[in-house]
Amino acid sequence: MESALARFDATVQRKGIVLQPDGTPDEVEGVLNPACVRVRSGELLMYPRCVAAGNVSRIGLTRARGSVDDPSFERLGYALQPDMPYEVRTVPGGMGCEDPRVTFVPVLDRFVMAYTAFGPDGPRIIVALSDDGYTWTRLGPVDFAAHGLPVGDDKDGVFFPEPVRSPSGMLSLAFYHRPMKKLSTMNGHAAIPTLLAMPAIDRESTRIAYVPLASVQADIANLLVPTESTIVLAPDGAWGRLKTGGGTPPVRIAEGWFSLYHAVDAVDVGGRYAMTYSAGIVIHDLEQPHIVRYRSNAPVLTPEHPDELHGVVNNVVFPTGIDVLEDRVFDVYYGAADAKIARVRMELAPVAAAAAGETAA
């Protein structure tokens, strides 16, 4: 385990909108919050959440065309559509397959997708697998109950690409998740004062869950059965005081596991709370990711552009996809105001500059 980082600098350049609704019924309420991954051929695939009328979500399949600096995305259909019982509801309010993240896991030699199913039991994390990134097979819902872990509404599943050590020392595959408070899902904005009055550790916090690697290698179905889970990002910093959630799949850099996460602030405006979704950097220890080496003391990406300020849900940047271009240079794909998909180019400072000094965003 290495020491905490006192400073970590990055530059962020907005590159604009890369995908927006095409006018068809399946996208009338937005395209947003995409996964992305380089498949074995080197092609970049992106998996947008496509939202039809009534908040019915599907996971699209698109392929990048053009140059790295100016990609366009060709629609190829859908990776997953809501047809399982845990994805289908008969009451108003929406249903479907939401907010995917995709990670290639070499030890499994497979692409692993985690997404949120919005069905009769509420939001649940589902895992799907693919050999090529094009054709996906559902493994099923994550079973947190099997080992007495938090059970209920849960979102923001994101897998780490390599085995790590759990808090107990078990070599494991790991994934982010974010259990939700029942009053949050039932009462919406009305629950915000109650949530903010709670101790930060009791608000909606990002956790890492761990699945013993040996059990998964014995039976891939065990990927759904985590044995440990621990809080890694409580909403206890200078920003994002309402809740935090996992964002992009972690990427190995010299300092640790690098990821962008989202966090939410709520401000009372004339008796109604206005929420802002921003993004920050987190770096986890490479061997024991429950140890956080660095966390942004200010957002690195906040809603500023009109496409981020005004949409289906105003004031939202929601990073979910990352494409590694070269060492310490990434394209990050994110949902803008729950309506469109945008891209930023992020470049991390050289390793030497991240060793000491004042904390930076």
Model regions and ranges:
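Catalytic core of Fe(II)/2-oxoglutarate
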Residues: T244-G246
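C-terminal structured domain segments
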Residues: V312-N315, P319-I322
